[in-house]
């Protein structure tokens, strides 16, 4: 398979004007290093979340690093605020291009991550949230609710969310007739942050 290298401005660094080189496969998928970070209230679900994320991400050529918590019994009991700090360090250092995290509702994790420079985190509940967040907002992190509404079929919903999250090139705009205004709005947001 022929790989093409080109320049792509993306929010994976503290300076959004920094040009980051991302390898694109011929079929158009871009390659990311994805970090999974779980906090203490939902740590017991880490293995299931990781398996679902890894299955989808690797099928698209991405890699996934699991930063834990790995179980509810881990000695290090991470809060979503600590996860926000870790996410900011990973994203701003270039150790990760994207972060998947969450908490009981996903709200606290989203707020914590968005408290740090260089992080643009969306709250994602379903596959359409995932798709529109990546197409419209082109962020570098998502926070999921791992307790609220997380019952029967939760692993299926996770798989569908990850499939839509990593579908195609981010920042393409949605709906298609709104691509130009959406991309303009994103640049304004980047300038404010």
Report the location of each language-model feature.
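Short, Lys/Arg-enriched N-terminal segments with co-localized hydrophobic residues
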Residues: 10-31
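C-terminal binding/interaction regions
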Residues: 42-44, 131-193
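A short, small-residue-rich loop immediately preceding and capping a beta-strand
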Residues: 96-102, 121
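Short Gly/Thr/Asp-enriched flexible loops that form oxyanion-binding sites at enzyme active sites
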Residues: 108-121, 125-126
């Amino acid at each position: 398979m022929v790989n093409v290298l080109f320049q792509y401005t993306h929010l994976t660094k503290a300076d959004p004007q920094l040009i980051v080189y991302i390898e694109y496969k011929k079929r158009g998928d871009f390659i990311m290093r994805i970090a999974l970070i779980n906090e203490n209230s939902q740590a017991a679900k880490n293995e299931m979340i990781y398996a679902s994320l890894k299955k989808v991400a690797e099928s698209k050529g991405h890699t996934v690093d699991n930063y834990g918590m790995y179980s509810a019994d881990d000695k290090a009991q991470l809060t979503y605020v600590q996860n926000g700090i870790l996410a900011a360090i990973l994203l701003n250092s270039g150790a990760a291009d994207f972060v998947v995290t969450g908490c009981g509702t996903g709200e606290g994790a989203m707020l914590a991550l968005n408290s740090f420079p260089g992080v643009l985190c969306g709250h994602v509940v379903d596959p359409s949230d995932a798709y529109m967040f990546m197409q419209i907002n082109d962020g570098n992190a998502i926070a999921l609710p791992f307790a609220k509404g997380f019952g029967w079929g939760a692993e299926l919903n996770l798989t569908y969310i990850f499939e839509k999250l990593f579908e195609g090139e981010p920042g393409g705009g949605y709906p298609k007739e709104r691509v130009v205004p959406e991309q303009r709005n994103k640049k304004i947001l980047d300038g404010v942050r």
